[in-house]
Each structure stands twice: as structure tokens, then as C-alpha cells.
Amino acid sequence: MSPNVEVEPTLDDRDIAAGSEVVGAPVGRSARRGTGQMALIVATVVALAGYALSIFARTPCISNGFNGIGRYTHLCYSDIPVLYSLRGFADGRLPYLDHIPGQQGFEYPVLTGAFAQIGAWLTPIFGGGGIGFYAANVLLLGICFLVTVLATGAAARPRNWDAVLLASAPALLVAATINWDLLAVALTAVWLLLWSRKLPGWAGVVLGLAIAAKFYPLVLCGPMLLLCLRSARMSAFWRMMGTAALAWLAVNVPVMIMNSPTKPFVPGSPTLAIVATMNSAA
């Protein structure tokens, strides 16, 4: 099938075809076929609706400032407003660089720290405080979720409708804004999209950024290695890994240097574990 002609789910999957009877039955075989744009539009609408529902489900926590036992009993806990004060964002401190006496440093990798700092800069627009910080990050993470859905749909062609499965994932309701994971998820989706377009160099850059946001994308390199071995694409794989390493270093080395051995090490992201070794040896 041409990659420009989308796969119709109701014609490709018997279970989906059976379920479609509720909403009008499978598409007719003589129906006009799309090119994938409609699938991405529908996925976008579903993603926006699902994300809005996810935020609405956190209304009990938002109404009481994410305090009290209700954040657990209502399943609406989030690290984001809690860490606003505990990690120094409320005091204008920068992650990894400004030591907070008696408190742990920001425990996420460097790119996630930068992302959270952007949220801190936007917080006054949303009224300030932990709730304002949460609102700013909801906006930023919503953009990440849309990028994830659209990149997945574009990479999955001609199965563009598969993006709707991601957009409507039940896990979104409970996990979308627990912390900043959607940043790494979005970067991972863009990485796979660029790889599918046979752009290993740029794919590696985005992979490096994804690893600088969260370490789990590194785990996906194992299956990617096996696929490249099977398809004789090892040259592209090593090019991707090389640019990934450069991108990761470009993000982390400046922070390592600024958090120099002459300053007290702030425990936090495992990304900066090398700095702890430098400080202890100094």
C-alpha cells in the first residue's frame, strides 16, 4: 500500500470493525480515501479533550492547593506544585546551581530542570504560587503531549489512525501531569519520527536531548540496535548514537562546569553524578 494512503482501521482490524457498528459500521469499500491528514486532526481533537479531562480530574487537588490527604484519595497528586517551594523555584533559585541549605537539589535530569525553570518564569502570568507554577507547566506539558501525538501519527504512516490510540490512552487521565515525563515522551516521539524519515544525524540530536530529559529513552536503543543489525543499518545507528552523545554533552557539560568543585555539590539528578566524584576528589 502507498505510504500516502492511510490504512482504514475498520477495514484492517476485525475487532475495530465489530466495535464500529455502534457508531455507524465500517467504512464502505467504495468510500473516498484520505491521505492521513484527517487522522491527525481527529487525534489532535481527541488529545486536547483527553488532556482537558485529565486536568479536570485534578480539580479536588487544585481547589485545596495540592495539600492534605485528598491528593492521594482523589488520585490527583502531582510533584509539580510540591517541588515549587521544596526545590527553590519559589525563591528564584536555579536548579543544580543554587544550593538550598538543608534541602535536596532538583532530582530530575538537566533538560527537565530547564523545562521546569521555564515554567517558573511563566508562573507570575498564572497568578504565582504553587498553583500558578502547576498551571504554567500544564500549558507546557500540553504542548509536549500534542507533539507526541502528531509525531507518532506522522511516523506511523500509513497507519496514521494509530495516533488516536495514544491520544485516548487511559493512562493520560492519571499520569499526564504527575511530573515532567511528557517532555521526554515528546522528544522520544520526535526522535522516532526523524529516524523513520532516514535522518539519523538529527534523530541522534533529539535522542540526546530526550536522554538529557529522562533516562528511559536510552533503554530503547537496545531494540533499535537489534533492528539495525537485522536490516544492515549499523552505519546509521552509530551516526545516530554519536550525535546523541554530542547533544547530551552539550546540555550537561555547561551545568557540570558551572557546578564546579569550588561550589558545594547539590544532590539531585543522576546526570550530575560525575560532579560528585569531582568534588570528592578535589
State each model region's role.
Residues 176-184:
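Short acidic/glycine- and proline-prone juxtamembrane loop motifs at membrane-interface regions
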Residues 2-156:
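TM-lumen/periplasm interface segments of multi-pass membrane proteins
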Residues 151, 184-199:
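Specific aromatic-rich, kink-prone transmembrane helix
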Residues 205-227, 250:
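Transmembrane helices and adjacent periplasmic/lumenal helix-loop junctions
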Residues 219-246:
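Perimembrane helix-loop-helix junctions
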Residues 150-169:
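Transmembrane-helix signature of polytopic, membrane-embedded enzymes
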Residues 194-209, 242:
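Short hydrophobic alpha-helices at membrane interfaces in multi-pass membrane enzymes
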Residues 237-282:
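Membrane-lumen/periplasm interface segments of specific transmembrane helices
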